[in-house]
Amino acid sequence: MKNIFLIFFLIFGMNSSFAEEGKEKPNIEIFQDWIVSCNTDNKLCIANQTIRTDKGLPVALINITHVAGNTVLEFGLPLMMNLQKPIKVVVDENMISTYGYNTCSQSACFVIRNNDEKLLDSFKSGNKATVTAESIDRKRFDLTFSLNGFTNTINKLEGK
């Protein structure tokens, strides 16, 4: 569990360091609907896909890292979700699993999966993933992510 949170903080530390003035910009590659950002020596990379509103504001995201043989998939979901109700992940109409929340920050709540081969394999073979969450006022939200380019994204993260 320590490794999950270490990677979680590496992800956010890496993202914020990219934004710091005077720092070199990350190397960015696009694999269809996924973006991979790496530091300048390509030793630390993060892949993500973000669902945005019509005005461009982020609603939800999936971040993926691969560090020291661990592939971590992180769902970032809006605040005000019912944390007692796990999210449900469906890939191409096939129920994969339900997952409880791990933590929340000031901007989002997170479900973190470490080396979840069933989830990763289903993403590699699928076309779309739908994450269903429930708000605190019991409204259901279906958030659909494209899986186009996911396998190439994972291959990049794993150095293949």
Where are these regions (language model features)?
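Sec-dependent N-terminal signal peptides
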Residues: 4-13
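A generic "folded-domain core" signal
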Residues: 19-160
